[in-house]
Amino acid sequence: MDGKAPAAYVDPAEFNEVMKRLEKIDEKVEFVNSEVAQRIGKKVGRDIGILYGAVVGLLLFLIYVSVSSMFTI
């Protein structure tokens, strides 16, 4: 080896066909990645909604307890 990278000569038609197949594969990979990200986002959104609901419920309970304790003897 004289330090040069090996060169390969490919028929342009074959090269274009391979590039089209690679583009299709890339589109499928991007689609799957976006679906996975969307599912993760839905799970995170659900968890945040549950936490907000718990906090609001706790605040309402504390307000109820404090208001009801003011009117009892």
Swiss-Prot record:
* A Gene Ontology BP annotation from the UniProt entry: one-carbon metabolic process
Identify its membrane topology class: Single-pass membrane protein
In short, the EC number is 7.2.1.4
Can the keyword Hydrolase be found in this entry's annotation?
A: no
Task: Name the predominant localization.
Answer: membrane
Q: Which reaction does it catalyse?
A: 5-methyl-5,6,7,8-tetrahydromethanopterin + coenzyme M + 2 Na(+)(in) = 5,6,7,8-tetrahydromethanopterin + methyl-coenzyme M + 2 Na(+)(out)
Q: Which InterPro entries did the record assign?
A: THM_MeTrfase_su_G (IPR005866)
Q: Name one Pfam family in it.
A: MtrG
Pathway(s) this gene product operates in, as recorded in its UniProt entry? One-carbon metabolism; methanogenesis from CO(2); methyl-coenzyme M from 5,10-methylene-5,6,7,8-tetrahydromethanopterin: step 2/2
One term of GO molecular function: tetrahydromethanopterin S-methyltransferase activity
Q: Keyword check for Methyltransferase, yes or no.
A: yes
Transmembrane parts of this sequence: 48-68
Q: Where located?
A: Cell membrane
| One GO term describing the cellular component | plasma membrane
Report keywords, A-Z.
Cell membrane, Membrane, Methanogenesis, Methyltransferase, One-carbon metabolism, Transferase, Translocase, Transmembrane, Transmembrane helix
What's the stated role of this polypeptide? Answer: Part of a complex that catalyzes the formation of methyl-coenzyme M and tetrahydromethanopterin from coenzyme M and methyl-tetrahydromethanopterin. This is an energy-conserving, sodium-ion translocating step.
Q: How does the annotation summarize its subunit structure? A: The complex is composed of 8 subunits; MtrA, MtrB, MtrC, MtrD, MtrE, MtrF, MtrG and MtrH.
The family line of this record is: Belongs to the MtrG family.
What is the protein's name according to its record? Tetrahydromethanopterin S-methyltransferase subunit G
Biological source species: Methanosarcina acetivorans (strain ATCC 35395 / DSM 2834 / JCM 12185 / C2A)
* The encoding gene: mtrG
